[in-house]
Amino acid sequence: MPFDKQNLIWIDLEMTGLDPEKERIIEIATIVTDKNLNILAEGPVLAVHQSDELLNKMNDWCQKTHSENGLIERVKASKLTERAAELQTLDFLKKWVPKGASPICGNSIAQDKRFLVKYMPDLADYFHYRHLDVSTLKELAARWKPEILEGFKKENTHLALDDIRESIKELAYYREHFMKLD
């Protein structure tokens, strides 16, 4: 098990909406890669219990998406609190990356970070202050080399583990076709 400060922590949350002042986390997943984006380990994929009242207040997009992908049923069946999910995730990460070493990695990761700061502050503090946001490269490619955007298509299941896997593949795609490091 390679515990290494160069390893990268990838995270994705699914939430009941976009406003951390009103909405909550309903799923969390993590993956650890090496610096070359090779997956070393997948962390626990955790549905976080939330009240029916909160779930019923989700907007139409969230209701439809999280019903179709089965997440609402998993959330209702879950007994996990946000704190329990946070602790399980931290237990996993501590085996792979020292505290403060990895930037938080993912797509539109600042949104996830806002929820972590509010509801999982110990996990938020585990990351380096920097972000590795794949959506930054997507935005730059759209402006500087839009033709390469056609080469990568997402499944968009809006399940946390699937979203992380896609983010890693997307960054590898941009590394090969946009950044050309060779």
UniProtKB/Swiss-Prot annotation:
Superkingdom: Bacteria
Residues annotated as catalytic: 129
- GO BP: any one term: DNA metabolic process
Coiled-coil residue windows:
none
What name does UniProt use for this protein? Oligoribonuclease
Q: Which is one GO molecular function term here?
A: nucleic acid binding
Q: What is its EC number?
A: 3.1.15.-
Checking InterPro entries in the record gives: Exonuclease_RNaseT/DNA_pol3, Oligoribonuclease, RNaseH-like_sf, RNaseH_sf
Enzyme's top EC category: hydrolase
Q: Which organism is it from?
A: Haemophilus influenzae (strain PittEE)
On whether Nuclease is a keyword of this UniProt record, the answer is: yes
- Supply the NCBIfam families for this chain: PRK05359.1
